Amino acid sequence: MGEVKSDIEIARAARKQPIMEVGAKLGIPPEHLLPYGHDKAKVSAEFIAAQNEKRNGRLILVTAINPTPAGEGKTTTTVGLGDGLNRIGKKAIVCIREASLGPCFGIKGGAAGGGYAQVVPMEDINLHFTGDFHAITSAHNLLSALIDNHIYWGNEQAIDIRRIAWRRVMDMNDRALRQIVGSLGGVANGYPRETGFDITVASEVMAILCLAMDIKDLEKRLGNIIIGYRRDKSPVFARDIKADGAMAVLLKDAMQPNLVQTLENNPAFVHGGPFANIAHGCNSVVATTTALKLADYVVTEAGFGADLGAEKFFDIKCRKAGLTPDAAVIVATVRAIKMNGGVKREDLGRESVEAVRKGCANLGRHIQNVKKFGVPVLVAINHFTSDTEAEVRAIKDYVRTLGSEAVLCKHWAEGSAGIEELAYKVVDLANAGHSQFSPLYPDEMPLFQKIETIAKDIYHASEVIADKLVREQLRTWEDQGYGDLPICMAKTQYSFSTDPNLRGAPTGHAVPIREVRLAAGAGFIVVITGEIMTMPGLPKVPSSERIRLNEQGYIEGLF
């Protein structure tokens, strides 16, 4: 076996087509592509608006089982499946999220796929790309600055500085900024108060950009952001301090989807990037709805496991955007299944069919959960060289007992040729008309009951633990007209429970609610459980230690 090339070496050797040629495959005229160099472009809002009357293609969701810290290749499989569909003669577009610098320099690496199933230019996508995250960070922090400025110049809106709900953000993992005191240094610097930073991907502005239908909807949602409360507990909105217009101006270009290509020169939209453990975990509605007008098949992903990303894709994104998924693919790896079967991380390379059989309970739970939404399921076994035939067979046999099918996929090593079988089966499943999509709960269900429904039906918890303050806050929001909003659970991605170390398919556990936040602009209620943080920290040995420029000026260590 020859030397295995790194992701960045493979991406750098790619024969990219000019982005205008990629756009032409979708019928996008050159004048409606706003190029950023030769290999990436934004699609104009005018072109997008003109596609409204076209019929939609088929929508395929790629999700996963509970992952290991390294991820299970969900983006890789999304990209590979898009290439596979194009390989068998179907017109397909991939829709994925943009990468955050936090995990890129932290533990998880980039978000452009891997091996021979990547989107390119990989280095750009994983770093600054077209500046969308900078624009989102700037718009968010403009609002933060305007809040403190409003208070400094007389506080006409009577904002209670003890009840300001808007923090600041940056696109980096930095635990030192979670809780800070601002405005120190004297009268000229304003009124000292406790505040803090979240990571940009947890920003409500990010969620708004990813859920807005167009620029008008974006500005309206920005105006609906609740920045804090008065002493009588009435909400103060971003529009009350006239912040929404300037924020929308900063986001004007960021609202337009980014067009790039796969290694096999197939089109891909990379747009938006909320995390699925602390936000709703899906790429933008604009990118997805545009892709559905331009292709016969759209393959999109939702972050982390199906308990987080898929649930939010169905209950938040599809509900709000009127989308109907035709099929779902759950990505599983032998190593993640073994980890869910109790194998330690350092022992994952050794064969253990028994651990696979035990860990399949986690996969089975995800299959059953996705089917609760009325969406038919296939399983993609993302192949690793350490997998054995017996382990793969055990997964296939187990999935068959649940009325679904598992397909071994080698797209990481072979590109589209390694995922042809899955592509054919996805086409058959999506066209069979089996999808009877319905969200998990109705809009009119009380907020706390919605939380209980997710906890009991998806996580298989026995109860939700919430103190009096949380329950009263939910009732207050219902009285204020927010009772019809969906729930966005903030929870560890490593387990069905709120304990990241509780693997497999646990039952009877409790879900403790630490805090609830109203994202009135995005249009959902964030429920923070367990120890989840909206500003992550870096690991002891961050990925950044391996990233450098070599003597030729090329980046090394990015993955």
From Swiss-Prot:
Coiled coil: none annotated. The keyword Transferase does not apply. Keywords: ATP-binding, Ligase, Nucleotide-binding, One-carbon metabolism. ATP binds at residues 68-75. One of its GO terms (molecular function) is formate-tetrahydrofolate ligase activity. It catalyses: (6S)-5,6,7,8-tetrahydrofolate + formate + ATP = (6R)-10-formyltetrahydrofolate + ADP + phosphate. It holds the Pfam family FTHFS. It is an enzyme of class 6 (ligase). GO terms for biological process: tetrahydrofolate interconversion. Its EC number is 6.3.4.3. The keyword NADP does not apply. Pathway: One-carbon metabolism; tetrahydrofolate interconversion. InterPro entries: Formate_THF_ligase (IPR000559), Formate_THF_ligase_CS (IPR020628), P-loop_NTPase (IPR027417). It comes from the Bacteria. CDD domains: FTHFS. Belongs to the formate--tetrahydrofolate ligase family. This is Formate--tetrahydrofolate ligase. It comes from Rhizobium meliloti (strain 1021). The gene is fhs.
